[in-house]
């Protein structure tokens, strides 16, 4: 166990698997109390058990980030349990694979917008007031290479991530005077359940792992310069070196 985040409380959305799980484990390993949130409680409980068995502190909370009532309630309960939230990691996201932009079903578009973009906004909306009041806090929003490079087959997902990037940079400017830093990560292809079976044949033998993204998140939470805000770190990895346009996480 390390102590880079000792006495800090981190809320991680989409923490039951993949990138969110890895970020939660890394932050707990550096001393943070971690609130794990997601739509399915069972994987969250499993991650919490893993963290606790390693000597860390974690709790699990069922949460649909697209629901304002649920976000408000869970943020209130976490703040009541641990007194504050120091670090917010907006990781929760979904993707509908292989849907051409022009024929994206409306229900798929709406669902991705609700979770990926609205969910990020709602969590910030209900966590930031306490950070602003304390004049300190860190927000880490997970974007995607699809938010910087157009993807013909991931239209809705790419649009949500373009939105997350734009929202992040605007939010950073508005809360900077209050001591709150807002940054993000743009992963490319990461080996997670969400990308299972989607790895391009020309992407090369290497594939970015969730732990790689988690280490970058730890940098933003513990090592980033005090004046670093409104910035995204691109993590396209070996996929980009292969010449294949990076795809979504």
Which residues make up each language-model segment?
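C-terminal helical subdomain
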Residues: 177, 184-185, 202-241
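Conserved glycine-rich cofactor-binding loop
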Residues: 9, 16-18
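Active-site helix of classical SDR
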Residues: 124, 160
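Residue(s) in the substrate-gating loop at a strand-loop-helix junction
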Residues: 144
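Substrate-binding pocket helix/loop in short-chain dehydrogenase/reductase
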Residues: 99-101, 108-113
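The beta1-alpha1 cofactor-binding region of Rossmann-like NAD(H)/NADP(H)-dependent oxidoreductases
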Residues: 41, 63-74, 106, 211
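Alpha-helical segment proximal to the catalytic Tyr-Lys
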Residues: 129, 173-174, 226
